[in-house]
Amino acid sequence: MEHHKPLLPTSSHAAPNPRTRKDLLLLLCALLFLSSLVAFGRNRASNVPHDHVSSSASNHQQEHQSPTSLPSSKWHAVSRGVSSGVSEKSSSMLFSGEGGASEAFPWDNSMLSWQRTSFHFQPEKNWMNDPNGPMYYKGWYHFFYQYNPNGAVWGDIVWGHAVSRDMIHWLHLPLAMVADQWYDKQGVWTGSATILPNGEIIMLYTGSTNESVQVQNLAYPADPSDPLLVDWIKHPGNPVLVPPPGIGAKDFRDPTTAWLTSEGKWRITIGSKLNKTGIALVYDTDDFKTYELKNGHLRAVPGTGMWECVDFFPVSKKNENGLDTSLSINGAEVKYVMKVSLDDDRHDYYTIGTYDENKVLFTPDDVKNDVGVGLRYDYGIFYASKTFYDQNMDRRILWGWIGESDSEYADVTKGWASVQSIPRTVRLDKKTGSNLLQWPVAEVESLRLRSDEFKSLKAKPGSVVSLDIETATQLDVVAEFEIDAESLQKTAQSNEEFTCSTSGGAAQRGALGPFGLLVLADEGLSEYTPVYFYVIKGRNGNLKTSFCSDQSRSSQPNDVRKQIFGNIVPVLEGEKFSLRMLVDHSIVESFAQGGRTCVTSRVYPTKAIYGAARLFLFNNATEATVTASLKIWQMNSAFIRPFPFNPDQKN
């Protein structure tokens, strides 16, 4: 049946919030039991009407395990990382902002088991953060990562290591480097790989010393003939770089992949800060053992704070292929990308511009979009990213760390924390010339199974349409949307301002939006995550489009951060509104307009899991009718397991 009821503000769908203000604790505790009964009754009775659209026979099978409820517990937030000079790594501290106790939601084993992803890379257990030293070598993609072998929280950081033939199916190898020297006693931190023209591998990484000073160290393979690169040797002359005069002992980290200068020297940059000005220091070297600090900075931006995980690479203005930094590349057909991870706000910013090798200076094309203040790789949860040139497929690949948004208590209970993004190709947007395009590597499509296709679905203002597919937990979704021409013509021009993060989410209605998809939703819409477009017709008659992901209704528990992510996305004349979405249990990666704007979310539903997870088309606009066409693939699981060493191989 037709449904015209719009999505409503959070209070209309969600159960009452059990969190209490301290000054009302006694009163609300007395009412807690009654409120819980009311909430239970509302949820049981919730049956939001909506259209059902089938492309083929659907089969919803309930796959819940027998729930084993975990006891609710007070969880005391503990700060992690700050004393070592890095940003807060405790999600519990991000919730409370102090070391007080927080009430943890009583997750059961069924819920926690569902959260583990099926085709995103993650270790078998424990904590993971930054991607390190990715490369292609002798037929294998190598991926190193920050890893705690002792628990599901940040600390005791070493380098994990895995290999793959396709960056989708992974084999875990023994730890590559551990904290066994004075210069990395407090952690083997982030680093980058450089493959020289002769095939030699150079690995530079930051070590946190026994006195928590950040220094740069050199490592190389013990056996370059080994395609798995199992064993690594740390240079006996480490550290090769220490903080220069004027730079704080805890403000000097994350060396980049080296690039070749026209003089045949190798050049790297390292993130730092001067007071609140983020800077990128530059060094030249002939042998990666001795270095010359260059005058000035590659780039400096006041007010951006500490720069971590700086990345610097060329992109072609003409071709789709990637460019190799082991070659000296510059000229009229090349742009450079500078990216920094801001320690203060934990986002990855990039800008596009020109690079003067002689002046050792990067200049943005648009200072309004300077590094640290303008464009971002991803407007959701995506940090400490790293690119590499894939000489196997002649492309540039981007990895990003996707942290958790639940409580540290839940992470410790389930025994793991964090995943990596699906690797993305990166190239210059030739149509705009002012932004990058990011897209999941083609190899992920090998996981596609059966598909459902929906053509020219009409979604009237205020409607929700059920898309009857087999399951909605592991999906690859491609969708296009069109606003009917009559609505566009009749809609009045407006000075309305809209920002995803400060809006009312998908419940905020406008003439031309929001419209998109409700993912990981339950049948009664008590939990759902909207991924959507919001369109405004400006005073000049032009359309301004935002692409957003709204977690505010994604989960009923309160020990989960429920933010609204997104940003403006350029939609050029003649283009439809297009998105692609990879859904893998608790992670949703979304790409608008071919990857001009990307948003990654972590969601932790308690009802919309296993066979109860649904997918809906929605249009919460007040005036516009939207036509949508979708193709939806069920996704297989990737094989991610320990490497099957033979008895005579290393174990």
From Swiss-Prot:
The entry annotates sugar attachment on: 210, 275, 620
What is the protein's quaternary organization? May be present in two forms, a 70 kDa monomer and a heterodimer of the 30 kDa and 38 kDa subunits. The ratio of the levels of the two forms within cells appears to be regulated developmentally.
| Cellular localisation | Membrane; Vacuole lumen
Please tell me the species this chain comes from.
Phaseolus vulgaris
Q: What is this protein called?
A: Acid beta-fructofuranosidase
Under Pfam families, the record lists: Glyco_hydro_32C, Glyco_hydro_32N, INV_N
From the UniProt record, list the reaction(s) this protein catalyses. Answer: Hydrolysis of terminal non-reducing beta-D-fructofuranoside residues in beta-D-fructofuranosides
Q: What is its EC number?
A: 3.2.1.26
Which InterPro entries does the entry mention? Answer: Beta-fructofuranosidase_N, ConA-like_dom_sf, Fructan_Metab_Enzymes, Glyco_hydro_32, Glyco_hydro_32_AS, Glyco_hydro_32_C, Glyco_hydro_32_N, Glyco_hydro_beta-prop_sf
Q: Name one GO biological process term.
A: sucrose metabolic process
Which residues, in ranges, are excised as the propeptide?
A: 1-103
How is this protein positioned relative to the membrane? Single-pass type II membrane protein
Q: What class of enzyme is it?
A: hydrolase
The pathway to which it is assigned is: Glycan biosynthesis; sucrose metabolism
